[in-house]
Amino acid sequence: NYSVTYATGTLTVNAKALTVSGVTANNKVYDGLTTSTLNTGTAAFVGVVGADVVTINVASATGTFASANVGTGITVTVAGIAKAGADNANYTITQPTTTANITARGLTVTASNQTKTYGDSALGTSLFTSVGLQNSETIGSVTLTSNSALSTSSNYIVGSSTITPSAAIGGTFTITNYSVTYATGTLTVNAKA
């Protein structure tokens, strides 16, 4: 009863997205940077169909922390994982994410030795040195106190005493990224001529 005409259609086959397993990020000590080192020794694609040949290449894989600051469970975004093999054109790659920790770095703040003459001004807040700051960070000031007794005129007593630093603040550093150790210096007060 019919004269049938058949018309063609189009089949579009999209590449399948592969996920990646076996990639982890190493914890690190704070260095002021977001770069992460990765463990890729067991990296593998998940989702390859049947006997398709698709190999993973992690030679250019990189990891980036979401934040450079100290923290736990910080997201690490992975990039640069590539594919090869006879059937690789049938697939795309979903780059993985993982997490890792950044722990505080040791920072030593040392009071500089000071020599004064009886009647000189106070110790100030800038005579100190530091070891451990990262990425050109700076400390603005440090509280410096002495265990020297004070005379009735509020001048340090002649002799030697300890300068104790504390409360590093300011500058460009963030104190929560460091485990701070304070080391003392020596105050020498000479008699006034």
Residue ranges, per PLM feature:
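Short loop/turn motifs that initiate or flank beta-strands
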Residues: 1-193
